[in-house]
Amino acid sequence: MAFRSNAALCGAVLVLAVSVTAARSGAVDSSAVLDAASGDAIVGAASMYNPFRPGWREGGPNTASGERYDPSVWAAAIKTSLREKFGGVQYGAKPTYALVEAVGKKVIVKINDVGPLTPGRIIDFNERTMRLFDPSLERGVIHGVSVTPLSGDWIPGPVG
């Protein structure tokens, strides 16, 4: 009898975990995001950075916010000269978020770093974010990217 109870409990926990994960991974409603836009959009080019790839000269293992660079989250580095428009990204500060739009797709990213080191770019995506816009990572640069600061706290990810 104890085995049945433990199995039932494990099953219930598994179902709950899957439900929560599915709910969090769903796209955010576009109208809610547009209501939170807290500034004019900046339009320009974007590229990708990953300080752990051999030969990359950009950044280091830690971001400007103090977080370790993680290629698997929805994050980006905003151009240093735009730092104040995006909440003054700095070590230990509360993260800020932005709505990024390009090639017919939208995503909320956490702005946790500054850069890009490449002239002419307004934002550098980490690997996960870049894969949304360029799944093969072959483009290298995406032009016509719109980046809008968001007020408040957000769960980063695609916007539907």
What residue spans do the PLM features occupy?
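Secreted/periplasmic proteins
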Residues: 23-160
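Bacterial N-terminal signal peptides
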Residues: 10-19
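Bacterial N-terminal signal peptides that target proteins for export
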Residues: 1-10
